């Protein structure tokens, strides 16, 4: 599906928990018709301990949302 929304565009979220937020597009996923928007749909993800990070812990990461839930601002 062809989309007007590209990476680094400024968009407004029109549906969901983050409705009304204006933010930058970090990635576009054309196969699934989804976009990753900066600061929207943030989840807390557990990280297992590794050699680089011996304690492990949690990180906050943006999850994709459907492209129909955003419009260009």
UniProtKB/Swiss-Prot annotation:
GO biological process terms on file: translation
Keyword Transmembrane part of the UniProt annotation: no
InterPro entries documented for this protein: KOW (IPR005824), Rib_uL2_dom2 (IPR014722), Ribosomal_uL24 (IPR003256), Ribosomal_uL24_CS (IPR005825), Ribosomal_uL24_KOW (IPR041988), Translation_prot_SH3-like_sf (IPR008991)
Region of interest (Disordered), ranges: 51-73
Pfam family, one: ribosomal_L24
GO cellular component: ribonucleoprotein complex; ribosome
CDD domains: KOW_RPL26
Alphabetically ordered keywords of this record: Ribonucleoprotein, Ribosomal protein, RNA-binding, rRNA-binding
Gene Ontology molecular function, alphabetical: rRNA binding; structural constituent of ribosome
Tagged with keyword RNA-binding: yes
Biased composition (Basic and acidic residues): 51-65
NCBIfam families named among the record's database cross-references: rplX_bact
UniProt family annotation: Belongs to the universal ribosomal protein uL24 family.
Subunit structure: Part of the 50S ribosomal subunit.
Functional description taken from the UniProt entry: One of two assembly initiator proteins, it binds directly to the 5'-end of the 23S rRNA, where it nucleates assembly of the 50S subunit.
HAMAP family for this protein: Ribosomal_uL24_B (MF_01326_B)
Protein name, per record: Large ribosomal subunit protein uL24
Species, as recorded: Helicobacter pylori (strain ATCC 700392 / 26695) (Campylobacter pylori)
Gene name, Swiss-Prot/TrEMBL: rplX
